[in-house]
């Protein structure tokens, strides 16, 4: 017996959320003192310049944005991320998007969250919103310790399909 279900695909940033979750996460880490503001802003400005010129290497950019993870366990990051979810993400959830998500659930449709956001943030948000299917940029781990690298390909454009 074949069951045909409709698939509803949602983006995360400025759709389900009223913010850019990766940028909000980095701002949060800077404001809490986990990342040095001056160092981050200087390096980020260089990436933004390359982006405007059309020369940005997204893998390098993502790995720059997750360097703070390197050599840390998910348990360590989990406590920090939990506070971030309460303080930043919960108030940023778009109530209209949430209603739409629930309408799809009520129709027994499959839902997919497809985002360029890193797994460190997209995963917990997907869990909070009860998405079973998630495509995001995956932060690499070895023995439950973050390496500071991402798995190829980044979840942008065609990378969301691979």
Positions of predicted regions on the chain:
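Active-site neighborhood of HAD-like aspartate-dependent phosphohydrolases
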Residues: 1-53
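C-terminal cap/substrate-recognition subdomain and adjoining C-terminal extension
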Residues: 2-5, 79, 86-162
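Conserved active-site and cofactor/substrate-binding residues in soluble primary-metabolism enzymes
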Residues: 20, 72, 159
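Active-site phosphate-binding/coordination module
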Residues: 22-24, 28, 33, 74, ...
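Short, compositionally biased "basic patch" segments
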Residues: 49-53, 58-74, 133-140
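Metal-dependent phosphoesterase signature
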Residues: 60-96
